[in-house]
């Protein structure tokens, strides 16, 4: 019975802490994204009538290129992190085989 109480308490504590951390992280990332794209204000102020202009198409293309570059960096970072985990697992397996 005590384990169920500990689980429920831990679950609720994890939910609260996760919500706080997620909220803070979300606001920081949203603020950073807003400061990195000053061209967004320009697009918003031009109105709907000029959405097909060459300048707006070029602006959208640059934004997409930037986002793709950011995604590639994140993918490379995760690949590196997972590579280190795989290396550690392989070392542990080899050590266990030699025992």
From Swiss-Prot:
Q: Where are its TM segments located?
A: 10-30
Question: How does the record classify its membrane topology?
Answer: Single-pass membrane protein
Q: Where in the cell is it found?
A: Cellular thylakoid membrane
Q: Which GO terms describe its cellular component?
A: plasma membrane-derived thylakoid membrane
**Keyword Ribosomal protein annotated:** no
Which InterPro entries does this chain map to? Answer: Ssl2009-like
Instruction: Return the PANTHER family for the record.
Output: LOW-DENSITY RECEPTOR-LIKE PROTEIN
What are the protein's UniProt keywords?
Coiled coil, Membrane, Thylakoid, Transmembrane, Transmembrane helix
In this entry, which stretches build a coiled coil? 50-84
Keyword Metal-binding annotated: no
Mind telling me what this protein is named? Answer: Thylakoid membrane protein ssl2009
